[in-house]
UniProtKB/Swiss-Prot annotation:
It comes from the Bacteria. Transmembrane segments: none annotated. This is Small ribosomal subunit protein uS8. One of the primary rRNA binding proteins, it binds directly to 16S rRNA central domain where it helps coordinate assembly of the platform of the 30S subunit. Belongs to the universal ribosomal protein uS8 family. InterPro entries: Ribosomal_uS8 (IPR000630), Ribosomal_uS8_CS (IPR047863), Ribosomal_uS8_sf (IPR035987). The gene is rpsH. GO terms for biological process: translation. One of its GO terms (cellular component) is ribonucleoprotein complex.
Length: 132
């Protein structure tokens, strides 16, 4: 089966595993998915991410994070720019998610960045997703 939007597939897998409170999930790896997962880890939305070599494209194993009373850390995940409708923003238009409580993930000329990093570097790009 041909997958038209692998990033949306990854975000949906994270959202679904989070809803049923799974400890971990696996997604087919790619460079952009790996960078998105590293941002989620750095921003504290997931516990850990590891790359598993399987002599094909590899697998990303993502360990989800929950609060002390088993409450979800990720309350929302939304794909913004899709293959059929790309969404680009200029440096001064970089969006804020929930007034700074969430993050926007952007693909820029300087790599995959959060909205805060893009504002600091003064760069715009394609808005991949919102996470809150």
């Amino acid at each position: 089966m041909v997958m038209t939007d692998p990033i949306a597939d990854m975000l949906t897998r994270i959202r679904n595993a989070n809803m049923v409170r799974h400890e971990k999930l696996e997604v087919p790896a790619s460079k952009i998915k790996r960078e998105i997962a590293e941002i989620l880890k750095r921003e504290g939305f997931i516990r850990d991410v590891e790359y598993i070599e399987d002599n094909k494209q590899g697998i990303l194993r993502i360990f989800l994070k929950y609060g002390p009373n088993n409450e979800r850390v990720i309350t929302g995940l939304k794909r913004i720019s899709k293959p059929g409708l790309r969404v680009y923003v200029k440096a001064h238009e970089v969006p804020r998610v929930l007034n700074g409580l969430g993050i926007a993930i952007l693909s820029t000329s300087q790599g995959i960045l959060t909205d805060k990093e893009a504002r600091q570097k003064g760069t715009g790009g394609e808005v991949i997703a919102y996470v809150w």
